[in-house]
Design a protein with these regions (language model features):
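Cysteine endopeptidase catalytic domains of the caspase/legumain-like
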Residues: 1-282
Length: 282
């Protein structure tokens, strides 16, 4: 990490390999009517009674059968996320150490609630992971299984509204050694794709480890919270996420006692299916 000597070891959110130590739809569309006209056809409407919910799932301790270690530092992430999204105006809730069934049941319950008076929805997942998978305390579940609960054909009160998922978890076991660089609408009924209006912000690129400092929390979540607090009332969400990418890419480097794990880099991966610009209300 930058800013002088790191205050704790960096580790990863993934399964331990053998001999390794601890660190480590068819698019059918749905009909909807936008009852509130937009002043800007390319900007999401934030004029609702509530900004919306931010649901945090924070998994730290795992059953022995999973071979997953304790995610030290994740409570720091959870605390930062709670403070950041509360300040932005969200109604924040947190569920700690959730099994696979508990994760699915929780998000199923939330997806079936009435969000008609909310402008958007946010979910933050803090856990171990693998390619396309996220871990509950007792095993793994495909991330898509959780995401699709909020599709337009399943959660109709969030149709046409932004649904943001932030995922701090590994997506494989690849290590990035880094490389040297030289410098720097109207009221009408429409049909939209059921997968529209989602944004997935992954802590790392597909196939790679995601780093987490055991004392300070993860690189991605700490950077996300810092940029949201700094620019959340000014910039569009993709501009904010670009700054998150920049901070993680340039300001962090792994410090680890594990052979081959030191001096590694990380780049978040932002997948957007948003159909308009998203600005948090001032």
């Amino acid at each position: 990490m930058s800013d002088g000597k790191p205050s704790g070891e960096d580790t990863v959110d993934a399964r331990k390999e053998k001999g390794q130590g601890t660190p480590f739809l068819t698019d059918a569309g749905v009909d909807y009517t936008d009852a509130k006209p937009h002043s800007d056809a390319f900007q999401y409407n934030m004029n609702y009674g509530s900004l919306g919910q931010c649901v945090i799932i924070n998994n730290k301790n795992f059953h022995r059968k999973t071979s997953m270690g304790v995610r030290n530092g994740t409570d720091e992430d959870a605390k930062s996320v709670m403070a950041t999204f509360s300040k932005l105006g969200f109604k924040v809730s947190i569920a700690n150490d959730q099994t696979v069934s508990e994760m699915k049941n929780l998000l199923t319950k939330v997806s079936r609630e009435d969000h008609s008076k909310s402008a958007m929805f946010v979910c933050v997942l803090l856990s171990h992971g693998d390619d396309g998978m996220i871990y509950g305390t007792d095993g793994a579940i495909p991330m898509k299984t959780l995401f699709e609960l909020f599709r337009g054909d399943r959660c109709t009160s969030l149709v046409g509204k932004p649904k943001l998922f932030f995922i701090q978890a590994c997506r494989g076991t690849g290590l990035d050694p880094g490389v040297e660089s030289d410098g720097e609408s109207e009221m009408e009924t429409k049909r939209i794709p059921v997968e529209a209006d989602f944004l997935y912000a992954y802590s790392t690129a597909p196939g790679y480890y995601a780093w987490r400092n055991v004392i300070q929390g993860s690189w991605f979540i700490s950077s996300l919270c810092e940029m949201l607090l700094k620019y959340g009332k000014q910039l569009e969400i993709m501009q904010i996420m670009t700054r998150v990418n920049h901070k993680v890419a340039f300001d962090f480097e792994s410090y680890s006692n594990m052979p081959g794990f030191g001096g590694k880099k990380q780049i978040p991966c932002i997948v957007s299916m948003l159909t308009k610009d998203l600005y948090f209300p001032k």
